[in-house]
Amino acid sequence: MHRTEPTINCVHDGTRSLHLSIDTTRALPAHSGNEPTRTHLAAVRVSLLKTIPVAPPKILKDSSFRVTLRIDPSEEYCTMHRSKSLAFVALFAALISSSALVSIPLKPVPLVLQNAAAVLTGLLLGPRDGALAVLSFLGAGLLGLPVFSGGRGGYTALFAPTGGFLLGYILAATLAGAIAQHHRLSCTPPRGGGRALLLWIRLTVATLVGFLSIYSIGLPVLGYVLGLRTGELMLGVFLPFFLADTLKIALVVLLAHHLAPTVRRHLYRHG
């Protein structure tokens, strides 16, 4: 039994609907005398954007049929300008470094803005470029530049009690960028009340996870270096500092929401 691929004709009527006229004549058996075979359409690839699943149509007597697909406008296709991406990595690495100027010396760890800058970097640049920006910032500090809190620099900062928090910035940018679904955040502006609310929720969860991931590395290292127990870490470090971080979380969410269109306009091209 010889079968060939069906012919697919696409017609766009200017709305969100894409009409596919699919001729299955050539997909039928070569011999005659039988009713046309039922054709199962598993999926249709549209403009190389994504594979859109379609329910198998029931064809018993007709050799052609018409399918209407509703295109979701949130699935907008865009690609990244790689040269601009590297420029943004350098820009946000400088942002994280400059945020070291805002530091309140407290014990056992200072109150800083660098954790907020690291999470914001992940939200806007995504997990890969966000982590790359943090690594660039850490590399500058390891070379001796005074980019760590309090104007510190050098490899000894990583072996200090707060060294775990610096390493946690990498995880924070990665997780925040991944949870925020960076590609959709950067490529697709929110449309409609439901989607706008979903964007706020996604940004809030991503930011919260980013901050908590910094503590997940920083607290164990701090406890190991200073010999503090878990209870002492939770009551003396985590609770008071995380209460202050709630204000930074709100600030990061607001900044990410308002800066995402700028990133989308400069960093991505559509088509």
Swiss-Prot record:
Probable biotin transporter. Belongs to the BioY family. It is found in: Cell membrane. Its main location: membrane. The lineage of its organism: Bacteria, Pseudomonadati, Spirochaetota, Spirochaetia, Spirochaetales. This is Probable biotin transporter BioY. The keyword Transcription does not apply. Pfam families: BioY (PF02632). Keywords: Cell membrane, Membrane, Transmembrane, Transmembrane helix, Transport. InterPro entries: BioY. GO terms for molecular function: biotin transmembrane transporter activity. The keyword NAD does not apply. It comes from the Bacteria. One of its GO terms (cellular component) is plasma membrane. It is a multi-pass membrane protein. The chain crosses the membrane at residues 86-106, 131-151, 159-179, 208-228, 235-255.
